[in-house]
Amino acid sequence: MKAKIVPEKTNLHPRNLHKFGYDFEALTTCSSELKNHVFTNEYDTQTINFSNPEAVKALNNALLIAYYNIKNWGIPQDYLCPPIPGRADYLHYIADLLATTNNQIIPEGENVIGLDIGIGANCIYPIIGNAIYDWSFVGTDIDEKAIQNCKKIIENNPKLIDAISLQQQVESRFIFKNIILTDDKFAFTICNPPFHNSAAEATKSSARKVNNLQEIRTKNPVLNFGGQNTELWCDGGEIGFITQMIYESAKYPMQVLWFTTLVSKRENLSSIYKTLNKVSAVEIKTIDMAQGQKNSRIVAWTFLSELQQKAWRF
């Protein structure tokens, strides 16, 4: 008997290609590897074990083939393997944000350039942004191995070669310095900042995630989405990273239309707003997002007046 495919109630952006959940029957036709991980649960629904990193990688690979025409995608072991629907949501909300300064028309094409802070080894944001909106990207990271893996993904997909450029941040204490150069113009920046304050905190969180998914305890938790140290934690955690980003952004007020970042912890918003006011941000927006049971938000800010925003040319 064929398993039922029940669309999830995801609360994703209306344009999100994944808003009806995962059609595993269709996805397994794209990836034999994924087929090995799909099973029918007690609710007679097809699914995978989301606490298994290899299963999540196989799902991502199938999604990238089926929806974004990306071949030979892969990441090294223990690197962040992000849930694609949530990453796509961020970009759809960025598109809506750009439309507010473009007569409510979403700007598309290679002249819309985004800066991905912390691209990781997966290259997900530029892949999705280019596939859906034909945007161009500069991706940065302090991790040379992550940059090299993104380079491999791009080389495996010739359509990405002219759309995505990569730059390693050689001074890890900086975010925009060395990256935004004198003549650069970016329509937006995106960032999924390190969440935790320390490696110990990251490990504890990973154990909790696995327990929630598997309903078992383990002494050596496997991160269901992986993650290197630089992806998961930094001194000061999320609020420390975002605070530094805000102060640095003030040095490039005319070169970026919208600076943005994900904010996982709602309690950090008050401090973020105070810092943005300190650096005299002209406009601040908070965009709520939801994926299943997980709630997050984007904070966006600009140093451009309304007239300057309207005059921006993509």
Curated annotation (Swiss-Prot):
Pfam families: Methyltransf_10
One MF annotation (Gene Ontology) recorded for this entry: 23S rRNA (adenine(1618)-N(6))-methyltransferase activity
EC id: 2.1.1.181
Annotated coiled-coil segments of the chain: none
GO cellular component: cytoplasm
Location of the protein in the cell: Cytoplasm
InterPro entries with a match to the protein in the record: METTL16/RlmF (IPR010286), rRNA_lsu_MeTfrase_F (IPR016909), SAM-dependent_MTases_sf (IPR029063)
Primary location recorded for the protein, binned into one broad class: cytoplasm
Annotated GO biological process: rRNA base methylation
Signal peptide: none
Swiss-Prot/TrEMBL keywords: Cytoplasm, Methyltransferase, rRNA processing, S-adenosyl-L-methionine, Transferase
Substrates-to-products reaction catalysed: adenosine(1618) in 23S rRNA + S-adenosyl-L-methionine = N(6)-methyladenosine(1618) in 23S rRNA + S-adenosyl-L-homocysteine + H(+)
NCBIfam families named among the record's database cross-references: PRK11727.1 (NF008725)
Entry's family note: Belongs to the methyltransferase superfamily. METTL16/RlmF family.
Function comment: Specifically methylates the adenine in position 1618 of 23S rRNA.
Name the record gives this protein: Ribosomal RNA large subunit methyltransferase F
Organism in which the protein naturally occurs: Flavobacterium psychrophilum (strain ATCC 49511 / DSM 21280 / CIP 103535 / JIP02/86)
Gene transcribed to yield this protein: rlmF
